[in-house]
C-alpha cells in the first residue's frame, strides 16, 4: 500500500469515533436520565452541548491547523478527545458529563478540519482527492448513521459510560498510527486564530439557547431570563460587527446577503434540526413508552439512519437530472409528508408503516442536505469557496444542536401540559412527574405499585400526545419552508439534462 493511502487510512481511523459520537447518545438518553438522575433540561444539555460548542470552535481550529500543521492538530485533538471520553465515562453527575461533552466537542473541532486538510495535502491529483473525500464522507455519514446502533449494543451489555469509554483504546491506537504514518507539515505562524471571537460566538449561542429553554420552562425569574437573552444578543451583535469590519473574518457575513446561499444555509440547518430532533424523540418514545431496550430502539431507528447516511449519491443524481430548485423543494415536501404521517402512526402496531415513512424521511433529508451544499457552493464566488464551506459546516452543527433543543423544548412543554396525574402524589412529586417522562419513570420506582402503574400510564399517554404534536408542527413548518425555498431558488437555472 502506498504512503498516500496509508495516510488516508490513519486519518479515517481517527474520524470514526468523532462521527459515531455525534449520534451515539440518542438511544442513551433514557438510560442517562435514570442512571444520573438528570432532569429533562440537563438531558438536553448533555446531548446538544456537543454540537453547539463544535459550531463555534470548528473555524478557529481550522486556522490553528494552518498555523501549526494538520498533523499536530490531529494529534492534539485526538488526545483531548480521548481524555474527554474518559472524563465523560466516569462522570458522577449530569453537570460533569455536560462539561466533558463540551471538551469532547473541542477535540472533535480539531479533528474534523485536520482530517480534511490532511486529505487536501496528501492527494494532489484531483481524481484521487475526490475518491479520498468520498471515503471520508462515507465514514462520516456511516458513523453517524450507526452511532445509535453502536450505543444500543454497548448499553445492552455494559454500563452507560461504555459509550464513551470505547473511544479511549481507539484513540490510543490512532495516535500511535498517526504519529508514525502521517507526514509532518510546515507551520504558518502568521495565520490568525480568532480564538476570542470563537469563544464569544459560543457564549452567545449558549446564552440564547439557555434563555429560550428557561423562558419555556419558567425555571428562572423573567428579568433574569431577559438579562441572559440580552447578553447573548449583545455578544452575537459584537461578533457580527467584528466579522464585517475584519480584513480576514472568521465568518464572511457578506455571503449571507446572497439569497441562494442564505437559502442553502436555511435548508442545511432545517434538515439537521428535523433529523436529529426526530432521532432523539424516537429514542425516548421507543424506550420509555414501548419498553424497548437501547439495542432494540437502535434497530427500530435503522431505516431513517441508513437512508439519510447513504442516499447522497441518489440525491446528487437527482440534482443533476431535475435541478436544484426541484430537488430542494421536493426534499422539504417529502420531509413534511413523512412527519405528518409519523404524527398519526402507532409505532407499536404499525411498524412497517413507520419504517416506510422513516426511510422516506431519511432520503428526503439527505436530498435537502445535498441541495443545500449545491446551492451554497454554486452561488459562492470561487475565491470564497472555503468561507462558504465553513458557513455550511457551522450550519450543520448549529442545526444538530438546535434540533435537540427545539424538539426537546416543544416536547417537554406539550408533555407537561397534557399529563393527567393520578391522585396520591404530593405537590413536589406531581411537579417532578410533570417535568419529563424520564422524571416520571424515576419517581415511579419509589411509589406503591398501583400509583406507579397509574403514573406510568398517564406519562406514556401524555408523551404520545406530545410526540404527535411535535411531529405535526414540524411537518407544517416544513411545508411553509418548502414554499419559501421554491420562491428563493426561482433564479437557479436547470441543468441541460432537465430541459
Predicted regions mapped to residue ranges:
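MFS-fold secondary transporters
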Residues: 34, 84-89, 104, 178, ...
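Hydrophobic transmembrane-helix bundles of small-molecule transporters
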Residues: 134, 156-268, 274, 281, ...
